[in-house]
Amino acid sequence: MASTGSQASDIDEIFGFFNDGEPPTKKPRKLLPSLKTKKPRELVLVIGTGISAAVAPQVPALKSWKGLIQALLDAAIDFDLLEDEESKKFQKCLHEDKNLVHVAHDLIQKLSPRTSNVRSTFFKDCLYEVFDDLESKMEDSGKQLLQSVLHLMENGALVLTTNFDNLLELYAADQGKQLESLDLTDEKKVLEWAQEKRKLSVLHIHGVYTNPSGIVLHPAGYQNVLRNTEVMREIQKLYENKSFLFLGCGWTVDDTTFQALFLEAVKHKSDLEHFMLVRRGDVDEFKKLRENMLDKGIKVISYGDDYADLPEYFKRLTCEISTRGTSAGMVREGQLNGSSAAHSEIRGCST
């Protein structure tokens, strides 16, 4: 019979415990071959609220539409911009989950006097209050996500977002790199972005808080783009010819702005190959989402069971994709300000 010490040793080995007494690390999810073999220039990254919420979880306005409207309402109340009855009405609409786009539109109208001068609107003040000092509110795990996004951009990927914040641009600036924020009010720049002439620009399809006049909540707000056939054709060609990778997006494809830009005129969507990274969570909900998205040409992929699994999964994916992009000669020296090492390496992996 084996000694007690030997038995303990065998048990430790069976359960994967080592000298430090730590349990084995969780086995990482495998990367989907059809995604990991993409090159950066073949991708359009779509950044949703889930990414912003992961980067700065202490900012409620980043977590959802409802959270943003509540934060704007709180700011308006703090600045004494609403009558008691008005604030009660808005609070009631939020509590009852009324159409949030309409609620947001009504609130913005209330904060914006009848003038074309954005500087004279209180809406701008409320926005700046809501998104104040975002740099100091970023968490390290969230920065890892932004680092991966930035690395793919440097290697040729395009980026668009449904978010109003500029967290990615702020992170890039902290790394000594300059990204441009675009919105749909500038048709010329949007066209150049779609033609891949502004790869180091982030397209905010709802606008960005630093330019309140460019914020749109409904397709009616950017008819100039929708009526510009050249711009729309270039935008839709992206959805037909590239692979969109949805990050932290959930149901972004149901967003009226996204649909108007990318989905409505695109035929045979089920023949396309796009990807959506989501937390597995509830199994039935996951299966339902996967089935619904396949009709739109989107493969739903689980990065893990917990939100905390995303940064590491996306980092591994970025390393794999960037390696292929670099070997194909995608990295161009001097593309961004900063050292050449930044172009070829991401922390924890070599490309």
From Swiss-Prot:
Annotated positions of the N-acetylalanine modification: A2
Keyword Acetylation carried by entry: yes
InterPro entries found in the cross-reference section: FAM118 (IPR038916)
One GO CC term, this protein: Cajal body
Record GO terms (molecular function): identical protein binding
Keyword Phosphoprotein: yes
One matching Pfam family: SIR2_2
UniProt subcellular location: Nucleus, Cajal body
Major localization listed first in the record, in broad terms: nucleus
Taxonomic superkingdom: Eukaryota
Location of Phosphoserine modifications: S9
Keyword terms of this UniProt record: Acetylation, Nucleus, Phosphoprotein
Family affiliation: Belongs to the FAM118 family.
More about this protein: Overexpression changes the morphology of Cajal bodies, while depletion disrupts the localization of components of Cajal bodies, reduces splicing capacity and inhibits cell proliferation.
Protein's job: May play a role in Cajal bodies formation.
Protein name stated in the entry: Protein FAM118B
